[in-house]
């Protein structure tokens, strides 16, 4: 199901990031910690615009569902249950034609020793299942020891060891002042990172092609 773009977009619109952030920062500080884009919006500027604004200008060309999306920090510009439902409806029709059974179960591992992280994952479960309906999508949270969690995320020996669907167990900090310091991490040629971030070893697999990562490579290079 995760290979379906509409399904992935439905999940993106279904996650309440303010509530997620509030598990660490408190209710009043939840929104201030929200970021809606992988690259920090004001990380770099060109032609009088910051990076986030340049991306927002192009978003509508990706699909009508992206019109009006605000990528600025400290507000949840992506959480939209109505858009989530609309995207899921498109995905469900295609997935049913492929024989996918509902509800779709998504495995989500979490380090059980971190109460805050457990609460964050539970907040994702609540918002996704509320927006899309438990008869459509169920998040199965797997609370693991710190060692077991690390062995399937940060310290996984290979992609096959990363047997999960969603995870909060990955992170990245920039190394230099260019968007590529973020964007290159997700290129198919970034072998160690593709294993850790997206769970694949073979850059030429059918899944890589289907979700558009080869096209992503070209866009970053251009």
Give the positions of each predicted feature.
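Append "and occasionally in soluble cytosolic enzymes with long acidic Gly/Pro-rich linkers
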Residues: 2-130
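Short helices/loops that flank or line small-molecule/ion binding pockets
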Residues: 6, 122-130, 147-164
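Extracytoplasmic/peripheral linker and loop segments enriched in polar/acidic and small residues
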Residues: 9, 13, 17, 21, ...
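Short secondary-structure boundary/capping segments
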Residues: 27-30, 124-125, 156-158, 181-188
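Residue-level recognition of the N-termini of beta-strands and the immediately preceding loop/turn
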Residues: 100-106, 136-139, 164
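Short, glycine-/Ser/Thr-/acidic-enriched flexible segments
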Residues: 113, 171-174
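Structural alpha-beta junctions
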Residues: 129-141
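Short beta-strand and adjacent tight-turn residues that come in two discontinuous sequence segments
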Residues: 163-171
